[in-house]
Each structure stands twice: as C-alpha cells, then as structure tokens.
C-alpha cells in the first residue's frame, strides 16, 4: 500500500507549481538551527510563553535498542543516573540547585527512555537572572558526556529501579510487551523491554553501564533545544563556548544499526489473556515500511501524512457512529495511521475496538467489517467534505493561536524535526500551505490510495 500511496501523492502534487519536484518545505526563520564542529545539533528560539522562563532539552538519538544482551535495562538505568551526580554537579547538587529557583524534580526536571531515544528536560526554568541560564546549559553539557556513574550511586539506584520494575509489572505492561514481541518478531525489539530484568539489574557491573554511556552518548547523536525568554545570540554563543570540550567521535566509532522489520507470509495472530485486565480489546495492524525521513519535510511527505489524516478522521467518524447506536457491537473503536511509536522504520494502519463484556467476537467482526468496507468501497463525497472541514478548522485554530504557543510546544516541534525530519514551518507559511493542499485534495485520491 505504501508504494501506491506514495505514487498517488507524487501524482497529486504534480499539478501544483508550488509543490512541483518534491519541494523541500521552508524552516521557520524564528528558530536558530546550527551544528557544532563536534556534530552536536542545536535549536534556539525566543518565545515569551511564559515570560521570564525557558525550557531546555537534550535529545539523545539512542535508546534501549542499542543495548547488548548483557546490558538490558541500562539505557533506562543511565537516564536515572543522570540525576545522581555529574562532573560539575556532584551527587544531588543538580536537583538541589534547581529546586532553589523553583524547578522541581519530577515536575519540571525529568527524562524518559524509549527504544530509539532518550530525552532529558528542564521545563519552565526562570531565566531573568543569567546564572540560572548558565546552570541549565551546564546541566545539558554534563548530560552529554559528563555523568559521574559513581559506584555507590549505582548501587543505591538499583533498588529504586527494581522497585519501579515491580510496580510497573501490571497487566497493561504485560499486554504491551506481548504486542511488541509479535509486531516486531524477528528483530531486537522483540527482546528489549526498556526497564530490563530483575536478575540483570541486580548483578550488572559498573563497566557495562560505562561502556554503554561512552559508546552511544556522542555529540553526533545529540540535539539541544532551548526555547523561551532568552537572547538567541547570547545562548548560541554560550553553547559554542560550553560544548567546545566535548570531542568529536573518532572515525571508527560505532554506528547505529538501521533495523527493518521483516515481512511475513502469513498473518501474525496473538491472543493475550490476563486476569487483571478489566476490558477486552481487539486490534489489527497492517504493517509497512515507514516513509523515509528525508521525505518528511517535503511537499510529498506533507501530502502523504495529510491523506493519512483524512482517512483517520473519516474512519473515526464511522466508528463513533457505530458505538453510539443501540446495541452497538463495541464500546468504542477507531483507526490510526502512521508510526507505532517504537520502531522508526515501521508504520502501520491500525484498527482497534474495545469490546463489551462477553462480546469480543462481535467487536472483532464489526471492526473487520469496517476495514473491509473501506478497502472495497472507499469513502463518500459527503464523508470527505466533513473531514475536510474538520481538518481545515483544526489548521485555522493553530494559525489563530500562533501567538500563544507555549515554549514546550515549540520545543516538541524541533525535537520531532531532529528525530523524524518532520516540517518546522512558521505559522503563516503553514497556514497558507495547509489551505492550498487541503483544498486541492479530493475523495478520488483517497479512494485510489486505499
């Protein structure tokens, strides 16, 4: 389906002189984007929502999928250790100093680890005083290459993470892990659960954690994002000076493996049961190779994703109508298009439905019927027009609220641009482009694609 959809989009945008030749979309001129000599990327933007504050992020384009078999859980463990001392801020000094200026650990100061990325953030940091700006940048610097990883802190954190593992080990997580094992069968994703396993967390050597850190926390896999009430020139100068002691990686440094999920000749069928689950649900995934990153910030990529949005909106309306009927076959359901959020090389068309108690078969039949109805008959002109108006209204709201965008919303756009290559246009250009492409779309394009 992806090849057909890609061809249709290329044909569709070919009628527009603005979109001709797979035009690369312009970047917002209000954001300063650069790359240091060591390979580290940075994004800086002045924004006063809220005034007097800024948010600071460092994105590492590595995660649990980079672990060796004897390092399972260490990407997440390393994330915890980033708050337990660094070269310039030993032990709990980072947390203590930030708390004196109103930045609270767990609320404004946080991080997360995924399969393919690790992200650290300092949100809503007051920056009227330059020393606070300097502190936040110093923390980003230390998170890049200068986490201490002291033995006593590692041993102390083992208990914290083992308790987290026990606390999180509920039916929802077990169901998620089972789904991942089936969706990504035959790849490393099948064997990585982010937090690791009890035996490994108890017994891993410090050297394993250090090896993971030194091997993968490198500047060419890192991006800084600073958005807030700051002087862009000043912040850029500070970044260049402060990050200068982070060396570029050697030519023979390890490279990330691009993991492709193999196709299967037969459908993968999985039934997961757990006495702790309170509801039954059914899901169907049609997997496909993701749109390449280099196409995302182009007119082709934009139109490709727009077609997916149209289909999701129209199918959502169908599922909502069914769920609201008397004696509906399911409580709710829908369809989503695009990334599953785990493996960057895989996309899917996903149908789902939540079943009434004892009526799982009914939910599946109704869901499958809607999938087949879409595949065989497509959509009507009326459905398309309603979806078009909904998408246009959403786009207009984005434009209307363009002067009220929070620091973290801008930051997320820039993080997505770095990680996924998604568009980063200014509000005026995006609004004009939306109107042009949405109004150019028609139901025949959608139906041919699906």
Protein language model features and the residues they cover:
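Scaffold signal of the M16-like zinc-metallopeptidase fold and its non-catalytic homologs
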Residues: 22, 84-86, 111-116, 132, ...
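Active-site-adjacent, His/Asp/Glu-enriched structural segments that form or flank metal-binding
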Residues: 51-52, 60-175, 203, 208-221, ...
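Mature N-terminal segment immediately following signal peptide/propeptide cleavage
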Residues: 24-58
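Sec-dependent N-terminal signal peptides
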Residues: 4-14
